[in-house]
C-alpha cells in the first residue's frame, strides 16, 4: 500500500480549501510508522541529485533517496557487496549509504567496496553495501544511492505545524486480506494525530492506495481505477479486433478468387 502525498487544511475547513504535498517525517512516524496491523512501513523521500565523490578522485552525479531500514525489508535487492544499513544505523543516524553497481564502478572500478568511504555533497558516508542497478521504472524503489533520513536534517524541513515535508509512505501488508484493517488503523491514527494539532488537520484523499491506483494518482485527484481498467480493456479489444478483421478480409478475398477460378 502507498501514501504518495497528502492534503492539509485549516482545522474545520473544507477539503476543497486545502494544500497538497508530501508528508513530514513527523507525520510519517505518527500516522504510518506506528501501524500495528502492517508487517512493515518505510518512509521514502523523492530522488534528488547528489554529488558522489572520492577525495581528490572520481566523482559522479547520482539519484539519491533518504529512507530507513524497513525499506530493505519491503523491497528486495540483490546485494553484490556488503549489506543494507540496519535499524541501529537508522535509529542512530549513522552516515552510511548503499550504492548501485553503476555508481560503485564509476567511482572505484569495482562493486566490492563495502566499508569504503565516499562523499555525498562533500559529507563523508561509509558504504554499507552495493546492489544491482534498479530500473527507473521501479518508481517506488529506484535510486542510485540510499541513505538513512536520520543522517540528514530532512526531518526539520517541515512546515504547516510540521505536517508537510518531503516523504511518502510505503506499507507492507502480511496479506491482501489485511488491507481493510490497515486502512482502518491508519484512519484512527490520522484522527489522533489531528487532535494533537492546534490549527491544522491532514487527510489522505482515499489513500493508502494499492499499487495500480498509486501509479495513476496525481496529487489531489483520486484515480478512477474502474474507468482506467475499462479504457485499457477497450484498447486491447481494438488491438485484437483489427488483425482479426484484416485476417477475415484476406480469407474472404482468397475465397472469391478461388470461386472465380472454379467458374
Which residues does each predicted region cover?
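Structured, solvent-exposed hinge/loop segments at the ends of secondary-structure elements
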Residues: 1-107, 111, 119-125
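Membrane-helix interface segments
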Residues: 58, 178, 226-230, 258-259
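Mid-to-C-terminal secondary-structure elements
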Residues: 65, 69-84, 95-223
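Residue-level recognition of transmembrane alpha-helices
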Residues: 122, 185, 235-236, 254
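N-terminal membrane-entry
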Residues: 220-237
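Faces of alpha-helical transmembrane segments in polytopic inner-membrane proteins
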Residues: 238-245
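Intracellular coupling helices
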Residues: 245-263
Amino acid at each position: 500500500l502507498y501514501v504518495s502525498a497528502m492534503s492539509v487544511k485549516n482545522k474545520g475547513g473544507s477539503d476543497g480549501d486545502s494544500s497538497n504535498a508530501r508528508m513530514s517525517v513527523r507525520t510519517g512516524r505518527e500516522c504510518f510508522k506506528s501501524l500495528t496491523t502492517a508487517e512493515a512501513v518505510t518512509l521514502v523521500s523523492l530522488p534528488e541529485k547528489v554529488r558522489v565523490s572520492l577525495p581528490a578522485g572520481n566523482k559522479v552525479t547520482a539519484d539519491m533517496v533518504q529512507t530507513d531500514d524497513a525499506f530493505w525489508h519491503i523491497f528486495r535487492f540483490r546485494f553484490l557487496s556488503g549489506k543494507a544499513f540496519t535499524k541501529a544505523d537508522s535509529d542512530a543516524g549513522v552516515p552510511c549509504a548503499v550504492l548501485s553497481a553503476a555508481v560503485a564502478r564509476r567511482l572505484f572500478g569495482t562493486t566490492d567496496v563495502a566499508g569504503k568511504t565516499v562523499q555525498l555533497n562533500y559529507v563523508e558516508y561509509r558504504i554499507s553495501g552495493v546492489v544491482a542497478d534498479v530500473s527507473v521504472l521501479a518508481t517506488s524503489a529506484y535510486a542510485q544511492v540510499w541513505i538513512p533520513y536520520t543522517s540528514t536534517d530532512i526531518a526539520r524541513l517541515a512546515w504547516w505545524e510540521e505536517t508537510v515535508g518531503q516523504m511518502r509512505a510505503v506499507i507492507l501488508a502480511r496479506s491482501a486480506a489485511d488491507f481493510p484493517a490497515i486502512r482502518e488503523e491508519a484512519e484512527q491514527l490520522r484522527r489522533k494525530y489531528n487532535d494533537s494539532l492546534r490549527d491544522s488537520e491532514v487527510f489522505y484523499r482515499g489513500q493508502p492506495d494499492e499499487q495500480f491506483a498509486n501509479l495513476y494518482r496525481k496529487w489531489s485527484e483520486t484515480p478512477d481505477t474502474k474507468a482506467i481498467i475499462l479504457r485499457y480493456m477497450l484498447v486491447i479489444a481494438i488491438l485484437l479486433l483489427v488483425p482479426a478483421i484484416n485476417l477475415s478480409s484476406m480469407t474472404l478475398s482468397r475465397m472469391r478468387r478461388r470461386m472465380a477460378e472454379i467458374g
